[in-house]
Amino acid sequence: MTQVTVKELAQVVDTPVERLLLQMRDAGLPHTSAEQVVTDSEKQALLTHLKGSHGDRASEPRKITLQRKTTTTLKVGGSKTVSVEVRKKKTYVKRSPDEIEAERQRELEEQRAAEEAERLKAEEAAARQRAEEEARKAEEAARAKAAQEAAATAGAEPAVVADVAVAEPVAKPAAVEERKKEEPRRAPKRDEDDDRRDRKHTQHRPSVKEKEKVPAPRVAPRSTDEESDGYRRGGRGGKSKLKKRNQHGFQNPTGPIVREVNIGETITVAELAAQMSVKGAEVVKFMFKMGSPVTINQVLDQETAQLVAEELGHKVKLVSENALEEQLAESLKFEGEAVTRAPVVTVMGHVDHGKTSLLDYIRRAKVAAGEAGGITQHIGAYHVETERGMVTFLDTPGHAAFTAMRARGAQATDIVILVVAADDGVMPQTQEAVQHAKAAGVPIVVAVNKIDKPEANPDNIKNGLAALDVIPEEWGGDAPFVPVSAKLGTGVDELLEAVLLQAEVLELKATPSAPGRGVVVESRLDKGRGPVATVLVQDGTLRQGDMVLVGINYGRVRAMLDENGKPIKEAGPSIPVEILGLDGTPDAGDEMTVVADEKKAREVALFRQGKFREVKLARAHAGKLENIFENMGQEEKKTLNIVLKADVRGSLEALQGSLSGLGNDEVQVRVVGGGVGGITESDANLALASNAVLFGFNVRADAGARKIVEAEGLDMRYYNVIYDIIEDVKKALTGMLGSDLRENILGIAEVRDVFRSPKFGAIAGCMVTEGMVHRNRPIRVLRDDVVIFEGELESLRRFKDDVAEVRAGMECGIGVKSYNDVKVGDKIEVFEKVEVARSL
C-alpha cells in the first residue's frame, strides 16, 4: 500500500495544506502537520465527511440513471438516407436498509401463513381419510352381516331389509365407486405424489405389520367446488390444475328445433338465417334450389321470407313495423264538436269538353285562357262562395296522360261533376273518370255542356253513360243530369243546386278545433320560395307556424297563401292553400298531418324514407330476377335517354308515365333523371354523362346549364303542352327504328326460246308478260314457280339493240349474269329493293 503524506495529498487534490488539515480535523482525524502519513481508510473517512458536509449523507448514491444513445442510418431509396437515433434510459434505485428489512419481514410473514395453511390442509386430509376408513369398515361389516343372514334364512325378505338398512351409510362410498369406474386415473404419478404429500403430516404412522394387516384405504375424491375456476386448493405448490374430462357441455338435439321467426315487411337473407339459427349459406343454397338466386345481403320481401322460413320448418310471425305510425295515429285522435263543412267537388271529363270553362264561369274569372294550349295540365283547387254556401272545386286534366291526377282528384273529393260535351258524346277519358268515381265511391253529377251548339244531342249522352252504369234520375237512377252552357251560363245555378243537394244528403262533417289534416293536391319547386305544396285541408284547422308531416317530408309552415296568392294565417276544413316551409316537394296524394313537435316529425319522416327505400329495393330486385330471361335481349334495344324537368309534381308523374309507355321491342324511352324546378347545371351534367335529351316542361334552364348545353352541343327543348312532348318523342323513336327493305316486283318475262352468244353465253328470248323489265336490276329465275336462281340482269336487247327497259307485250333478249341454265318455260322476275321508313 502506498503511503501518502498530508502535503502530497493536498497537492493531488489541489487545495492548500492548512485547509486540508482543517477539513481532516473536522472529520475527526488525528493529523496536525503536513508530514504525517494518510492511510486509505483515513482518505475514505475524509471523503465521506466531505460528501456529508455538501448535503449528501449517504456513502453511495441511492439512484443511478444510465443513458445510452445509438445512431443508425436507414436507406429510404436511391441515395437518400435517414439517420435514426435511439435513446435508452435506465434508472437503478438502491433501497434503504429499512426497506430491505421490511421486505424480509413481509416474506417471513407470508412463509408462516403458507405453512399454517399447509398444516390445516394436512389435518383436513387426515380427518377425511379417517372418515372414509370408518365408512369402509361400516360397509364391510354390513356386507358380512347381510351375508350371514342370507345364509341363515332362505327367504329374500331379510336380504331386502338388510339392503335397505345399509343403503344410507353406503350412499357416499357408492358414489365414490361409481366415479372411479367412470373416470380412470389419467395421471397416476401425480396422484401418488399428492397422496404421499397428504399423508406426510398425519399423526398416526402404522408399522409394517399393521400395513400388512390393514388393506389399502380407498383414496377419497378430492372435492372441487363446482363453481370454482377448476383449480384444486392445497399442496405445496399453492394450487394445481385438475385434469378435466374431455366432454362437450351439450348434446345434439334428437329432433328438429322449430323456432319462431319474426318477419317484417323486408328482411335480409343474413337476418333470416340468424333467426332460424342456420348459416346464411344454407338459406342461399335453399333459395337457389327454389329458383331464386340471391346473395347473403339481399333484401327479401315479406312473402318470400315467409315461404322460405315455412319450407325450412319454422313458425312464422308477421311483424308490423309501423309502431311509429301507430303512435302517430294515436296522438292525432281528437274529440271536439263536429260542424257541417263545405263539399269538395272535382270536375272531371274528357279533354276539351269544357271543364275549366265551366269553373271559369262559376268563379267569374278567366282561367282557361291562362292554360297552355287551352288545356288543363295541373290540378287547380279553388273555393267559391255561392248564395247557397261555399263549395271547393278541384279541376283535373282530361288528357290521357293525367290518369294518376284524375284518380288523385277522385280520392280527395266528396262529389264528382262529370262534364260531357253534348256535341261529342262519351269519350275514353269520360269512361275513365266514371271508373275513378265509382272506385272511390263518390256520387256523380253529370253536366251536359255545350247545349248551345246546334249539333248538341243530350239524349245520346244519356244513352252512352247509361251503358257505363250512370243512370239518369228521370230513368230511375241516382245521377242528376244538368244541361249547361259554360259559354252562356245556362244551367249553372241548377248545377250548383244539384251539387249542394248531394252534399246535404252526404252530411259532411269536420272538427275545426282539431289539428289540421289534409291531402297534397299538387307540389312544385319555386326558385325564390323553395318547395311549395298545394294542400286541401280535410279536417281541423291548419295554422301558420304549425309543424306538418307530409309523406316523407316535414317542415314548419312559414307562410300560407290562398288560391289567389294572398297570405292567410289559418285554413279550415275544405279550404285549399299553398304552404311554404317543407324540406322537399312531396308527392301529390300524400297525406298531410299536423304533429306536436319537430322531433316527432323528423323521426316519422326518416322512418318512412328508410321503409320506402327498402321496399323499393326489394321489389326492384324481385322484378329483375323474375324477368331475367325476358331481359336477356334487352341490351340489343335502342334506348332514348331523357332528363325531364317539370314545374309541378303531378305533371312530372304524368309525363314519366306517358313517355315510359312509348316504344316497342326495338326502341324504348328511359327517363334517367326527373325533378321539379328549373333545369340546373347538375341536370345538364347528367344529360351529358348519360347521352340524354333535356326536356323542360313549363320550366327554363339557368345560366350554368345553358353554358354546358352550348359548350357540349346538348339537345335541350322547352315545352308547355304535353301533346308536343309526346309527339316529338314518338318521332325520335321512329327515327331510331331505322328503315325496312321492301321488294317491289317491276316486271315478269316468260322464256320462249334460248340462244347461244359467244360473249354472254345463254341468251333467253323472252316475252314481257307483266310490268316492265329494266337492265342492271336484280332478278330471280323461276321454274314451275320455284326460285332456282337469284342474280342480276346483265344484258337486255331488242332487235340487236341494247335497251334500258322493255314494256309488257314486247319481246326481248335477256342475258343473265353468271347463269347459263335457262330453259324454255322459265320465268324471269325483275325486282328492286326500296327502303321504307318504319313507325311505332
From Swiss-Prot:
Compositionally biased residues, Basic and acidic residues: 95-143, 175-191, 223-232
Record flagged with keyword Nucleotide-binding: yes
GO cellular component terms, semicolon-separated: cytosol
Region G5: start-end pairs: 485-487
Record field: compositional bias (Low complexity): 144-155
Region feature Disordered, mapped onto this chain: 95-155, 172-256
Molecular-function GO terms, alphabetical: GTP binding; GTPase activity; translation initiation factor activity
Region (G3): 395-398
Transmembrane segments: none
SUPFAM superfamilies: Initiation factor IF2/eIF5b, domain 3 (SSF52156), P-loop containing nucleoside triphosphate hydrolases (SSF52540), Putative DNA-binding domain (SSF46955), Translation proteins (SSF50447)
InterPro entries named in the record: DNA-bd_dom_put_sf, EF-G-like_DII, IF2_assoc_dom_bac, IF2_II, IF2_N, P-loop_NTPase, Small_GTP-bd, T_Tr_GTP-bd_dom
Protein keywords: Cytoplasm, GTP-binding, Initiation factor, Nucleotide-binding, Protein biosynthesis
Annotated spans, G1: 349-356
Domain named tr-type G: residues: 340-509
Segments of skewed composition (Basic residues): 233-247
Segments for region (G4): 449-452
Membership in a protein family: Belongs to the TRAFAC class translation factor GTPase superfamily. Classic translation factor GTPase family. IF-2 subfamily.
Protein name per UniProt: Translation initiation factor IF-2
Species name: Pseudomonas aeruginosa (strain LESB58)
